[in-house]
Amino acid sequence: LSQAVLLYSKQKPYLEGIIYNKSHHITEPDEKYYVPKASEISIDTGLKSKLEVEEHGIKIGSPVVYKPQSVEMKNDCIAGTSVDDRAGCAVLLELARHLKKRKSGPTVHIVFSVQEEFNLRGAMSAAHQVRPDIAIQLDLMLATDTPETTEYGDMILGEGPGMSLFSFHGRGTLNGVIPHPSLVNLMELSAEQKEIKLQRSAQVGVLTDLSYIQQ
């Protein structure tokens, strides 16, 4: 609630809006700790009528996203909109710059997939076309260095990249990934040679495109 959003329309790249929040002065006690459903949320764009909304190209199904913002914090930390998985995109772009300089080596395909959060099928078409021998997925890793998350693992923000040794959705789909031991050894050896801290993780409730790429 009270979050800035962007509504994409045909007339402009977007319209700015705010998720409507009932005034604190008229909020009932039982409403103050209630999380509204998506169907109960309204967005105020400043437009005064249904006709005005339609004239600006806003229709049922028009995309709405949170307005991007970012904050630089201490110790090289950042907070922002959609860091999952723009951080992964940044890593891949830097990788592409390094690969461009090499003279020889195996073929590397870099894929930026879509709809991973929605149905996990965004990377499947690329996998069917490329048919890779090895697939490496870059995605978020659940940090467990705050008081309420310590029971879920030992992943500390800023202590190096994390390598998933086990992932399983566990909520409605029997799918996950256990990486091949030889690839795990390769990652650990490479990290050791480059003096890169490498953390390890095993999680239930986490699923990425890699679960479907391997099919």
Name each region found by the language model.
Residues 1-215:
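N-terminal hydrophobic/helix-forming segments and targeting peptides
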